[in-house]
Amino acid sequence: MSEFAIRNMDQVAPVSNMYRGMLKRQPAFDTFDSSNSLFAGYFLSLNEDQTLQEVPTGFDSTSYESNNCELPLLTPCSKAVMSQALKDTFSGFTKEQCRLGIPNNPWLWTEQHVCQWLAWATNEFSLANVNIHQFLMSGQDLCNLGKERFLELAPDYVGDILWEHLEQMIKDSQEKTQDQYVESSHLTSVPHWVNNNSLTVNVDQTPYGIQMPGYPKALSYPKPNLLSDICQTSTGPNLLSPEQDFSLFPKTQVDAVSVNYCTVNQDFTRSNLNLLIDNSGKLREHESSESGAESYESSDSMLQSWNSQSSLVDLQRVPSYESFEDDCSQSLCMSKPTMSFKDYIQDRSDPVEQGKPVIPAAILAGFTGSGPIQLWQFLLELLTDKSCQSFISWTGDGWEFKLADPDEVARRWGRRKNKPKMNYEKLSRGLRYYYDKNIIHKTSGKRYVYRFVCDLQNLLGYTAEELHAMLGVQPDTED
């Protein structure tokens, strides 16, 4: 065997100094008795030369035990494994949902469903210090909290797990709903485009390449099906003529965002879609603007505004305070609903609890189909809550109300919408926007005094006097 061959054999599997004490050379050299060999002197000198040429790396002092760590360092692969393990654990909640009848979509949960979910998670993950009383809210309110507010209510190191599970359930429910929607319709005409709850459009790919900016995809979860009893899908003929090419987006792109128009047992005509379709039969582009920390919040909601001072009998669109520059000058003509909010509450067997608002904003939002809670709904909730009369209350003169502490009202509105920077200046901007829509007017000559000028009596099913009596409101004698 030549010297060249021996050198190459010695270099077959070079090993770093870190593992040199742990690994042996090839067995052929271990069993070879070199004491009487012709190459004995060569191997000795080779090892000595190699030892002299080795440069210390700092790893030689590492103990053998340190290399036998049971838990390897996290890598992208191991993180994916851990994430999959969490998902597998979350899947155990499916059996609990079937057993207790908990809806798959967290937006549809009641307070009892939320408590049942927390009880399961507490037991499944052996969680401690979970105060369920802090989460006594509906699924819609829970989802509207936002991650930051949710983590504040949850114990340390626990909130992330619960929030991830909540997001996973919302995502799975949304994907399942979209799959069912795609299977049931090829989305080739407007009647297929009309959902039982809302009109939906795609934000990834819309007809003719029209994009719809301003809709935050992270918040485009399906809203609760609170209108299932009073809303039906139109089954009339196709609304567009054959020459108007209105083939909608392909089946693979169905990332829906609710446009929030309540379809209340209506007969659609071509004029009903003037907000959504222009003269060429194409979707109109919805535009919005963002300034500073303010962002477009879902889409405009609707308030039933049969104004006694005007001949309007349609439904007014009531925006949130962030969407002042959105084009809301037109309204979608629809017939009046078949029941009032009062009847709706009674049909749902939700009696007004002692110490609770007579008109909860979350339920009112579901009744009107507005999606996220709007400012006017929030004000009605505060005005029908006896505990809030120290900073906002009815004056006793019809639908007139006064902000005794406008900063406190703004603070509570910011807390509800998870906007810590909310102040009265921004709140009043939203109120001013309602002026032109004949929803709320400022009372002249009185500071912080406003009045609902829309027909709340038909919407709510209560007269102003009935609400005043329920809340113990006395007429305001101040000038």
Curated annotation (Swiss-Prot):
GO terms for molecular function: DNA-binding transcription factor activity, RNA polymerase II-specific; DNA-binding transcription repressor activity, RNA polymerase II-specific; protein domain specific binding; RNA polymerase II cis-regulatory region sequence-specific DNA binding; RNA polymerase II-specific DNA-binding transcription factor binding. GO terms for cellular component: cytosol; nucleoplasm; nucleus; plasma membrane. PROSITE patterns: ETS_DOMAIN_1 (PS00345), ETS_DOMAIN_2 (PS00346), ETS_DOMAIN_3 (PS50061), PNT (PS51433). Residues 373-453 bind DNA. Keywords: DNA-binding, Nucleus, Proto-oncogene, Transcription, Transcription regulation. Coiled coil: none annotated. One of its GO terms (biological process) is positive regulation of transcription by RNA polymerase II. SUPFAM superfamilies: SAM/Pointed domain (SSF47769), Winged helix' DNA-binding domain (SSF46785). Gene3D superfamilies: Transcription Factor, Ets-1, Winged helix-like DNA-binding domain superfamily/Winged helix DNA-binding domain. It is found in: Nucleus. Its main location: nucleus. It holds the Pfam family SAM_PNT. SMART domains: ETS, SAM_PNT. Residues 88-173 form the PNT domain. Probable transcription factor. PANTHER family: ETS (PTHR11849), PROTEIN C-ETS-2 (PTHR11849:SF188). Belongs to the ETS family. This is Protein C-ets-2.
